[in-house]
Amino acid sequence: YIGAAAKHTPEAFFHGNIDEVRVWDIALTVDQLRYVMNQEIEENSTFVAGSYLISKSVTPTKNDISSVPWSKLAGYYPMSIYTYTNTKDQSGNGHQGALRNLRTVDRQTAPLPYQSTQDGDWDNSNTWINGDVQTIPGTTSIVDNSLSINWNLVRTTHNVTIDDDSDLPSANGGNRSVLGLFVDSNEITI
């Protein structure tokens, strides 16, 4: 079971949303997992690639997933194609996923990528689409406050101001990093 604990009968259900599930035949490194965390994936010349970066025709210098063969992906369920109570395996391996105890399909709130929704301060949740349910991009980890989350993809179309670094670990020296920053229109002011 995914989203519940059980051997035979599910219990202790996960209270939240699951945007997609990936099953690998290889142990990925922490950096590889982070690289694809905020983007869907696709096959690119028999290797795994981040869909958002491909759509932008960007090949970042920090491409931690580029050496992982697509064939090592046993199952990929982006939860975007449903047939009754099943979800399609986008890995190409034909491992259809069965959805159980699902009462509703919610809108996608995963930051793929994070996107601005209005002019405002970077650290204000109202500046971001789904900012009320997602943490601010490029800020401190909610698990380890000595770690800055620097693997987010961010797309802005508004005037965004960064003038407060108080939520960053002191080791950052006031610097904020993200995996990819796309300023499609307007400006980011620091």
Language-model segment annotations:
Residues I18, L73-A74, V178:
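Core-facing hydrophobic residues within beta-strands of well-ordered domains
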Residues E20-Q32, V36-T46:
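Acidic, glycine-rich loop-and-strand cores that form catalytic or ligand-binding grooves
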Residues T85, T109-I190:
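Extracellular beta-sheet-rich ligand-binding/adhesion modules
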Residues M37-Q115:
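Extracytoplasmic low-complexity segments
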Residues Y1-I18, K56-V68:
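Extracellular glycan-interaction patches encoded by glycine-rich segments
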Residues I2, I18-W24, Y77-P78:
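Short hydrophobic/aromatic patches on beta-strands that form ligand-binding or substrate-lining surfaces
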Residues K7-H8, F14, T29-M37, D64, ...:
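Polyanion-binding and phosphate-handling cores
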